[in-house]
Amino acid sequence: MARAMNRLGVRPGLSRSDFKLVASGGFGDGCNSYTHSMAWFRNRLYVTTMRNNFALMRARLSIGLHSWPVETPADPFELDMRAEIWAYDPLEDTWNRVFKAPMIIGSHGKPIARDISFRSITVFQSPGDPHPCLYVGTWCPARGPGPLILRSEDGIHFEPTCEPGLVGLPVTTIRALVPFKGRMYTTPAGSRGGNTNVSGHAVIYESRDPAHGGWEPVSDFGFGDVENKSLHEICAFGDHLYVGTLNNNGFQLWRSTCTGPAPYEWEPILERGAWRGPLNQIALSLTPFKGALYIGTGIQGGGIDKQNDIGPGAAELMRVYPDKTWDLLVGTPRETPHGFKEPLSGRGPGFDKVFNGYFWRMCEHDGWLYMGTFEWSSVLAYVKRSKFTGAFGRVLGYVGPKNVLDYQSGFDLYRTQDGENWAPVTTNGMGNPYNMGLRTLESTPYGMFIGTANPWGPNIMPLDGDEFVFNPRGGCEVFFAPSTAQNR
């Protein structure tokens, strides 16, 4: 039976019981770690994957673990690193893998995956396109030629539209693809040194016809600030294109109408992490909702940036209005140049949960704003105890790592109608503690899809074991909830 609106004309929000699991175990391959992006195209849901995330982390990061949680070779590229694109037909309840990245010869003379992830996907119609097409931003290995933007007219055949590195830039990934005013905008990111977020070229690029390349820079490098290590996230809101940065002194938020001669005029809206400083290192997610732009923050590395000695710190949420005024919604009360700000929700960083290192993705659906987190407590059991001192170490020793994994771990998903009152949908990764993050949300005519980041596969080291075993709950997952008008 249809789920009726209440007397105020408000459609009820989704609850945990509304969601069903439609893909598990990394689409049958635990090496598929992240659902890195989603798009609705031709009555199907398209989901892109990133593979073997823990293997890549082991190769470039030292994070003080007494044993590595996932079985990985010394060289991650001994694994099949080729990213995939999957399509889901909700009427037939069927998945099909429509694309898998090809192998190429890397700069070291050996075969490697051309694409280890597809970090962005969107629907756009270029002037020469016969109809709206899929555009996909890739992530290439450091030994590859550079990232590409792929295009597909039919959702099956994907072809490059630009030279490697967009225009030959020294970057490794295309992080965002955003249509605005009939043009496409992107942010090249990543560097050859292995830093996936810091950009070798922190500039916004624009194309009026991305089917044929035509990319041109439309901003100064880092908006004129060398501390803006990447232009991390882009979002169209009203008459402006907004850009959030990664800055070790705290993110900045900029906007432009993208009119007049390039490079366009850009104006600053927020700085120094909305005056929280380094603990708001990145403007990680930007989403319009009911007349304001919502901003979720984070610290790279899931809430602890070992390279820059930032964190641990939990994420904050704020909103900015077109007149440049802003509210703190979830976070730490503080003085700012715009007066004293306290969280209107009454909740501290991370919704009072220190492990929520990212407010990673947001999505409006049926009049509600949904926000998912990255929650890192599942790693605690593998961290050397000497890393934890003081009260936190004592509490962890008392509770025990297995209890943390069983009862604490897994991403959170919250929803709100006004930005101030939030209700939890799940606080345990939809019942799977290995679902560390909610990486993607997509509102569709049929309902809402969510996709997870779950790098705990295929084989893991059990907390009480001494050899790797298969993890049936490892690998990314996708859940679906019908629109509330269709529920019950």
Feature locations, PLM:
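Trp- and S/T/G-rich repeat-edge/linker motifs of beta-rich repeat architectures
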Residues: 2-33, 40, 44, 53-119, ...
